[in-house]
Amino acid sequence: MQGGGGVSCAVAGDAPSSTRGGGGGGMLGLTLFDPPGGEQPAERIGRLVRESPVVIFARRGCCMCHVMRRLLAAVGAHATVIELDEAAEEAAASAAAAAAVPALFVGGAPVGGLDGLMGLHLSGRLVPRLREVGALCG
């Protein structure tokens, strides 16, 4: 990830690419702290959560973030993964009402961290909820 308060996005299961601006590897080229049109970071995060069926706020190198991505990929879910640097993490936590990273949102509603995801999965409610918001492959 490039320094200076940026954020990168990749679809769960894809390896992030070093290219920007929609290049290969699922990279969306999203910059959180330099958005076009004057959109503030909190507004941009809120919009991403509302517009995407499944959003994971993650940190590169976080083992819980990796487990969350792998579980969603294993059940066939399309997820938008937003990797935050330390400066962006504070804004995301504030804007998205997330206490910590990883933070998962399904259908615009907060699920929580890895414990919330595992609770849904073990109770058998994860796949139906993902299907309901249109996040499953196929």
UniProtKB/Swiss-Prot annotation:
Residues 42-137 form the Glutaredoxin domain. Residues 17-40 are annotated as: Disordered. Its main location: cytoplasm. It comes from the Eukaryota. Disulfide bonds join 62-65. InterPro entries: GlrX-like_pln_2, Glutaredoxin, Glutaredoxin_subgr, Thioredoxin-like_sf. SUPFAM superfamilies: Thioredoxin-like. The keyword Disulfide bond applies. It is found in: Cytoplasm. One of its GO terms (cellular component) is cytoplasm. Keywords: Cytoplasm, Disulfide bond, Electron transport, Redox-active center, Transport. Belongs to the glutaredoxin family. CC-type subfamily. PANTHER family: GLUTAREDOXIN. Has a glutathione-disulfide oxidoreductase activity in the presence of NADPH and glutathione reductase. Reduces low molecular weight disulfides and proteins. This is Glutaredoxin-C7. The lineage of its organism: Eukaryota, Viridiplantae, Streptophyta, Embryophyta, Tracheophyta. The gene is GRXC7.
